[in-house]
């Protein structure tokens, strides 16, 4: 199975996908290019599957990918992206067997004409 290089070295590509995956878990929708979104989809699908398992090994595996970002909820409680993945997001998809994300085309980006899309959690 191949992957997209996205014009970056492997460590830069891994860092970019970690940032995008964390942003998608936190805000539940991200606007990016089509190639990045298609690569991000596979990363996030695997993370949500780990979240559904819920055991300690899965939590540690997901912690290697997600950034340690804190989220302030409406009720003034602080939650990390990892806690949101294993709590709120995993509960939402207990009955769903994959296909956790949706990619919507927005059109070409103004600066360089790259195809822009919105990737969001279903």
Curated annotation (Swiss-Prot):
One of its GO terms (biological process) is translation. One of its GO terms (cellular component) is cytosolic large ribosomal subunit. GO terms for molecular function: structural constituent of ribosome. It comes from the Bacteria. Pfam families: Ribosomal_L17 (PF01196). The keyword Kinase does not apply. Keywords: Ribonucleoprotein, Ribosomal protein. This is Large ribosomal subunit protein bL17.
């Amino acid at each position: 199975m191949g992957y997209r290089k996205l014009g970056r070295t492997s460590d830069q590509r891994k860092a970019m996908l970690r940032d995008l995956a964390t942003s998608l878990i936190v805000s539940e929708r991200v606007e990016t290019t089509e190639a990045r979104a298609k690569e991000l989809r596979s990363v996030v699908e695997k993370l949500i599957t780990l979240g559904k398992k819920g055991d300690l090994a899965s939590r540690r595996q997901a912690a290697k990918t997600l950034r340690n970002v804190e989220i302030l909820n409406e009720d003034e409680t602080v939650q990390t992206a990892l806690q949101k993945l294993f709590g709120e997001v995993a509960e939402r998809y207990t009955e769903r067997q994959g296909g956790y994300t949706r990619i919507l085309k927005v059109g070409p980006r103004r600066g360089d004409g790259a195809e822009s899309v919105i990737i969001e959690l279903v």
